[in-house]
Amino acid sequence: MSGALDVLQMKEEDVLKFLAAGTHLGGTNLDFQMEQYIYKRKSDGIYIINLKRTWEKLLLAARAIVAIENPADVSVISSRNTGQRAVLKFAAATGATPIAGRFTPGTFTNQIQAAFREPRLLVVTDPRADHQPLTEASYVNLPTIALCNTDSPLRYVDIAIPCNNKGAHSVGLMWWMLAREVLRMRGTISREHPWEVMPDLYFYRDPEEIEKEEQAAAEKAVTKEEFQGEWTAPAPEFTATQPEVADWSEGVQVPSVPIQQFPTEDWSAQPTTEDWSAAPTAQATEWVGTTTEWS
């Protein structure tokens, strides 16, 4: 499909990207029309997709997209969450019309509908999940391109790109590869230099994971501020003025503080004491009488 041109051959870095994203890993089920794209079957039952055929079909799909004069006439669709961000990024890079989320039935066939469109080419992420736009495309003679897994039905699909269309990294990488090839064939970017856009921008991210990362970053920032505050706290300033001594041989004059005077008493005067020889009180006599009775 590449015409034996070295420029269009798959590079080693592209193969490494495919392997890292798991693009070559299919499912455990196999559609009879997808047998031509299978390289081998693993011992655990997972089919391995031939990446050479994937690259050839990717170039064919890019040529079909470039053949459309108006980029807005290309509709890219993804009803699954894993491909919605990739579809929007692809549309922003190539000028296509994205439909991310639920596809409204009748968009291609019902002319009185507000969202009615007449595209010239349709690209879907999953033929099984996006069966409604594929069915309507068959009614209006609309050519279609689809990212197909080993168990994907190929009905109403004109150009099938064999890949793993279930994983978020694989789907994002395929849309990134397709956008890069489209821009290269249009002459927007050069093949000699790498594309400055990273594939990570096309990957789907779970909102819960994003929220957890933001919370972790906020906690880390707060901890860092507290740690720095302990070490960078300003030292207390001593505002007490020190006495200036010109001649160190002279003593420092200490300011005199008046001493409060208290009245003095005559300690020689003895207080009057009671007569210890006096008879005990009546209460003591009563106690003595009580003890006498007990005896």
From Swiss-Prot:
Q: Which residues carry this modification: Phosphoserine?
A: S43
Instruction: Outline the segment boundaries, as ranges, of region: Interaction with PPP1R16B.
Output: 54-113
Query: What residues bear N6-acetyllysine in this entry?
Result: K52, K89
**Record GO biological process:** cytoplasmic translation; ribosomal small subunit assembly
Q: Where is this region: Disordered?
A: 266-295
**Alphabetically ordered keywords of this record:** Acetylation, Cell membrane, Cytoplasm, Host cell receptor for virus entry, Isopeptide bond, Membrane, Nucleus, Phosphoprotein, Receptor, Repeat, Ribonucleoprotein, Ribosomal protein, Ubl conjugation
Subcellular locations according to the entry: Cell membrane; Cytoplasm; Nucleus
Q: Which GO terms describe its cellular component?
A: cytoplasmic side of rough endoplasmic reticulum membrane; cytosolic small ribosomal subunit; nucleus; plasma membrane
* Annotated crosslink Glycyl lysine isopeptide (Lys-Gly) (interchain with G-Cter in SUMO2) location: K89
Explain the post-translational modification.
Acylated. Acylation may be a prerequisite for conversion of the monomeric 37 kDa laminin receptor precursor (37LRP) to the mature dimeric 67 kDa laminin receptor (67LR), and may provide a mechanism for membrane association.
| Keyword flag Protease | no
Q: Where are the [DE]-W-[ST] repeats?
A: 230-232, 247-249, 266-268, 275-277, 293-295
Query: Where's it mainly located?
Result: membrane
Task: Determine if Cytoplasm is one of this entry's keywords.
Answer: yes
Q: Please list where the region (Laminin-binding) is annotated.
A: 161-180, 205-229, 242-295
Q: Which residues does the record list as Phosphothreonine (modified residue)?
A: T97
Mind telling me which residues the site (Cleavage) is annotated on? A115, F116, P133, L134
Family per record: Belongs to the universal ribosomal protein uS2 family.
Summarize the protein's role.
Required for the assembly and/or stability of the 40S ribosomal subunit. Required for the processing of the 20S rRNA-precursor to mature 18S rRNA in a late step of the maturation of 40S ribosomal subunits. Also functions as a cell surface receptor for laminin. Plays a role in cell adhesion to the basement membrane and in the consequent activation of signaling transduction pathways. May play a role in cell fate determination and tissue morphogenesis. Also acts as a receptor for several other ligands, including the pathogenic prion protein, viruses, and bacteria.
Instruction: Share any extra remarks.
Output: This protein appears to have acquired a second function as a laminin receptor specifically in the vertebrate lineage. It is thought that in vertebrates 37/67 kDa laminin receptor acquired a dual function during evolution. It developed from the ribosomal protein SA, playing an essential role in the protein biosynthesis lacking any laminin binding activity, to a cell surface receptor with laminin binding activity.
The record's note on quaternary structure and interaction partners says:
Monomer (37LRP) and homodimer (67LR). Component of the small ribosomal subunit. Mature ribosomes consist of a small (40S) and a large (60S) subunit. The 40S subunit contains about 33 different proteins and 1 molecule of RNA (18S). The 60S subunit contains about 49 different proteins and 3 molecules of RNA (28S, 5.8S and 5S). Interacts with RPS21. Interacts with several laminins including at least LAMB1. Interacts with MDK. The mature dimeric form interacts with PPP1R16B (via its fourth ankyrin repeat). Interacts with PPP1CA only in the presence of PPP1R16B.
Which HAMAP family does the annotation name? Ribosomal_S2_euk, Ribosomal_S2_laminin_receptor
Q: What is this protein called?
A: Small ribosomal subunit protein uS2
- Phylogenetic classification of the source organism: Eukaryota, Metazoa, Chordata, Craniata, Vertebrata
Q: Which gene encodes it?
A: RPSA
